[in-house]
Curated annotation (Swiss-Prot):
Glycans are attached at N86, N293, N394. It is linked to Boudin-Mortier syndrome: An autosomal recessive disorder characterized by tall stature, long digits, and extra epiphyses in the hands and feet. In addition, some patients show joint hypermobility and dilation of the aortic root. It is a single-pass type I membrane protein. The lineage of its organism: Eukaryota, Metazoa, Chordata, Craniata, Vertebrata. InterPro entries: ANF_lig-bd_rcpt, ANP_Clearance_Receptor, ANPR/GUC, Peripla_BP_I. CDD domains: PBP1_NPR_C, TM_EphA1. This is Atrial natriuretic peptide receptor 3. Pfam families: ANF_receptor.
Amino acid sequence: MPSLLVLTFSPCVLLGWALLAGGTGGGGVGGGGGGAGIGGGRQEREALPPQKIEVLVLLPQDDSYLFSLTRVRPAIEYALRSVEGNGTGRRLLPPGTRFQVAYEDSDCGNRALFSLVDRVAAARGAKPDLILGPVCEYAAAPVARLASHWDLPMLSAGALAAGFQHKDSEYSHLTRVAPAYAKMGEMMLALFRHHHWSRAALVYSDDKLERNCYFTLEGVHEVFQEEGLHTSIYSFDETKDLDLEDIVRNIQASERVVIMCASSDTIRSIMLVAHRHGMTSGDYAFFNIELFNSSSYGDGSWKRGDKHDFEAKQAYSSLQTVTLLRTVKPEFEKFSMEVKSSVEKQGLNMEDYVNMFVEGFHDAILLYVLALHEVLRAGYSKKDGGKIIQQTWNRTFEGIAGQVSIDANGDRYGDFSVIAMTDVEAGTQEVIGDYFGKEGRFEMRPNVKYPWGPLKLRIDENRIVEHTNSSPCKSSGGLEESAVTGIVVGALLGAGLLMAFYFFRKKYRITIERRTQQEESNLGKHRELREDSIRSHFSVA
């Protein structure tokens, strides 16, 4: 994939800020973590004094983000009420433990770093005990480096790009409580192995700003590349005028299995044009990635109430949507209603009150409490960030929407579902398969009516498919009779011309050879006459 992400910020700048706040904090300096608090001996929970945990939440105030403070804050406060009340915290933490939370605007750039450093500098070393966020890649990178340097645990439902998986040095104190983009790549790999596919076209929107779709398909590209699968890539900027015909032509010229990432309206427009080009009758398999469990990205919905609905319903029979697997339980319903109520009180009306980020930051609080409990029991303190972050890795716990599993590298396993149209007449869609990240297993659901029939979708990846324009009401599969006749006649004419050229060339070569032999014979006779003439002259002399 072109220009893979390199998250770089000046180390001199980071070191300067670190020195500004260094020395007086209780956590010690260095990425190793835990060294400063080891000598205190082991204490039991009952003997520990109440803890005041200072949490710094770094998220953007701009509500256009799915992870804005307005959206996520109710989920964090819901989790805090749970752990401070009669829930997890009362059982795990010393009596009287309280969380003091500060919310700062991270924007989606350097402001997150400046907020953290300004807060520390103002109190000369009063570092927070926990950092939640940021989400945006370019905001999270310097904060994660600083957290590592200051021995602070950092939990985020973002920082999902492939670069953050390298935890051996600068990102050693980061735990990602939402599935990273590479986990989507692992899911797509399992799906391809199930269907015995080896080639894919990656088609995505890239505005060069947040680049969510770019980072998503970067994860898919990296996993496929490691496993030897072939990918072709085509990107566009959907914030500008789109040439949908050009997008579809590039798909036709590349692969039969297409993985797309864009807004729901753009996905619908691409599918409509593909349908008009006869590409939705089984020659192609289209997949759309629904990012973050948000309908802002293509969620598989074809209906808009416009004149194209009937055509879109037909087109979407060839589209499958990949989304996060969700286990609905009573507690989740209560959580969703409380988040919705809190958000609406702040004057924000939207469709997606609860998405991956809202769930993730709620679960981050629960995970931190579990890890802190184990660290305190072992005789360490809340300032031993390295110890705390290690306790968040390689474990499974119950989150708000189901089980959450973090791998040995501090990244959440991704569980995903595949949605497809199972009733073309009604346009009904349902889950047809699930991927379980911890086991690396993809399973088709039993007793589901698959649109293509068998459990495996057969796509001829090597066949070149000819396409003709067709109206929505006509069958768009195969070639018309006149086209077949034209191909046959053209092939016969071509063969006839080749044979005529062959015989002409053969006759011409024979003629040339005969003429050459005759000339050589005449030349020999002429030479003999000249020699006889010369001898006669010498004899006369």
